[in-house]
Amino acid sequence: MASMIALLTWALALLPALASAQTQKGFWDYFSQSSGDKGKAEQVQRQKLAWEPTSLKDSLEQDLSNIDKFLEKLGPLSGQAREPPALPQDPADMRRQLQEELVEVRARLEPYMAEAHEQVGWNLESLRRQLKPYTAELMEQVALRVQELQEQLRVVGEGTKAQLLGGVDEARGLLRELQNLVAHHTGRVQALFHPYAQRLVSGIGRHVQELHRSVAPHAVASPARLSRCVQTLSRKLTLKAKALHARIQQNLDQLREELSAFAGARADGAVEGTSQDPQVLSQEVRQRLQAFRQDTFLQIADFTRAMDQETEEVQLQLAPPPPGHSAFAPEFLQADSGKALSKLQARLEDLWEDINYSLHDHGLGHQEEP
């Protein structure tokens, strides 16, 4: 019953939390119209806020009856049972009385909602902890491969320094060899990153499935919506992991092209008799490698932040926080009313699905007391 309590609390609290007074008014007008004068179809059409009225009207009376029965079961929460109050026929009085009743009901139900939010959040934090070693391993590999490349592409040594400062043919030969080394070693590093990227992808799939099993007892969402949310999370994180791997490969391609072009330009300069400074060559290689390292680290950090954002969004979808929580409906408090309304509609559609599941499929009369 705790999941149904959380659903009801969220439903009752959502409208007062909205920044848009017009959105609140539209919902109440639609509620009043649906339960009062159902003959004015054209007025309902203007006030429905893009919801399909047919499906709502077909199930409204039965759902309200079920909710009345459910409210009767809330009596033990306050230590005494009471009959649900009769709703007045006047829409304004109905709205006022409902709001007064809901303030009291919400205060009693919020603890259950907060508990579900915390339990789901704990499981999502566990997912983030489980995936952290994969990204840490990627960063370690980037640092290690950069260090290896720096050693393998070193052009200043006991033998190479004399070649660069010697004749044209010796300098050009060394620079052409550097181009070949760049192509060989960057290609080898690209191959080495494949298994690490694959481990990240497979780890996402495995740990998200574990999340599905662990979060199911605490989520207020219906099983079908829970499954969709988890599958969407898995798909998004997998796509982001593959995109990260592709960017690392692109970074290595760019590194190879830049170093090869630099060595080629130096080789052409040697043909023209330009003096080649070994220190300049070594410094260029170091700078390019450090730029690759820094860019790749930033991209891995971006992936980690995106993972955090996606899991936080899933937490809001599966177990919204209580209305007093700072994270409650933050996206509605924005200037873009069209975007806010779209998010509100999606959130209410999810809520309606969950309530229908709890009232009909789950069986209201068979719920256990919290």
Swiss-Prot record:
Task: Give the transmembrane region(s).
Answer: none
Q: Which residues carry this modification: Phosphoserine?
A: S59
Give the InterPro entries listed for this entry: ApoA_E, Apolipoprotein_A1/A4/E
Q: Which UniProt keywords apply?
A: Chylomicron, Endosome, Golgi apparatus, HDL, Lipid transport, Phosphoprotein, Secreted, Signal, Transport, VLDL
One GO-annotated biological process of the protein: phospholipid efflux
The record's subcellular location field reads: Secreted; Early endosome; Late endosome; Golgi apparatus, trans-Golgi network
Q: Name one GO cellular component term.
A: very-low-density lipoprotein particle
Q: Which residues form the signal peptide?
A: 1-21
From the Swiss-Prot or TrEMBL record, what is one GO molecular function term? phospholipid binding
* Superkingdom of source: Eukaryota
So what does this one do?
Minor apolipoprotein mainly associated with HDL and to a lesser extent with VLDL. May also be associated with chylomicrons. Important determinant of plasma triglyceride (TG) levels by both being a potent stimulator of apo-CII lipoprotein lipase (LPL) TG hydrolysis and an inhibitor of the hepatic VLDL-TG production rate (without affecting the VLDL-apoB production rate). Activates poorly lecithin:cholesterol acyltransferase (LCAT) and does not enhance efflux of cholesterol from macrophages. Binds heparin.
Q: Subunit structure of this entry?
A: Interacts with GPIHBP1. Interacts with SORL1; this interaction leads to APOA5 internalization and sorting either to lysosomes and degradation, or to the trans-Golgi network.
Into which family does the record put it?
A: Belongs to the apolipoprotein A1/A4/E family.
Q: What PANTHER family does the entry give?
A: APOLIPOPROTEIN, APOLIPOPROTEIN A-V
> Would you tell me the protein name for this molecule?
Apolipoprotein A-V
Lineage, please? Eukaryota, Metazoa, Chordata, Craniata, Vertebrata
Gene from which this protein is expressed: APOA5
